[in-house]
Amino acid sequence: MKYIEWLNIWLNNYIKPSAKERTYIRYEQLIRTHIAPKIGGNDVNDLTPIVLQSFVTELLNSGNLKTGKELSANFVNMVISVMQNSLKTAHLVGIANEYVANKIKRPRAKEKQVECFSCQEQKKIENYVLNSGKDKLFGIVLCLYTGLRIGELLALTWEDIDFGKGLLFVSKTCHDGNDGEKHIRITDSPKTVNSRRVIPLPKQILPLLKGIKRRSQCEYIIADGDKPVFVRSYQRTFELLLKKLNISHKGFHSLRHTFATRALECGMDVKTLSELLGHKNATITLNRYAHSLLEHKVDMMNRLGKLL
């Protein structure tokens, strides 16, 4: 059996019924754009460790199909995961004589530098948003004070806020997709079990949200009139805002990093921060924000030194 034939069977019979829609779409795209054109025509049993490793090396050297830039190790590792999962199933059901994809050597992913906004940049962003008269932009401030991911933010509906108790409930996320004909927005369960969480809102945020709710024409908190907002559209809005304010470009996720950094600077303990961010455990938080924690320790020790 040709590998592409097996991949289609695997996608529709083993992935689509059990995985999140987002996972299915991602796998289908990786297969269509990267795997099928190169090794889809090979017989499943001709995919030796050397053939698979050569394909991985070619991927690393070929670059992004749109931009031409180098493909990240994380992206290539996603492709490897698709190959390994599909070929493992092929072996289990008797399509492949043996399972050899576990012999692929994965590229080492570079550790991403955590980027956050300075206090001055944060204040500049907040002042612009709060004085813009555009309720749609308020999501930027909300992320600075809750650490929400962009998908979690844009999936929020008014039912997710308990104004009486001042609580925000994170129970879903959203992402952009394509149904083959048009751009669509897909709402899904959160990234992980721990991503389901309750976030107490700062008391200064509540009256601002109440004002937006009074003016709102949509069930979603962040909206374009009576319509929800696409993830890429909101990212682009944020990029343009930074450009207008003459602040160096940072991804939308930097708002989440900024929240975490400010929380640590204010003395929040790591366990509480970990729960607010929806991390699996505090170790993840410690590893990701080690630099911020060190700066906080230096500041605390310098304050202590002033007692001498």
Model-inferred region functions:
Residues 92, 141, 145, 151-152, ...:
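C-terminal catalytic core of tyrosine-transesterase DNA break-rejoin enzymes
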Residues 55, 124-128, 180-186, 266, ...:
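DNA/chromatin major-groove-contacting recognition/catalytic segments
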Residues 112, 174, 206, 277-302:
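Catalytic-site neighborhood detector that most strongly recognizes the C-terminal catalytic loop/helix
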Residues 30, 34, 42-54, 64-103, ...:
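N-terminal DNA-binding recognition helix of tyrosine site-specific recombinases/integrases
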Residues 29, 119-120, 202-248:
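Active-site/catalytic core of tyrosine-dependent DNA strand-transfer enzymes
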Residues 155-211:
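Conserved tyrosine-mediated DNA breakage-rejoining catalytic core shared by Y-recombinases
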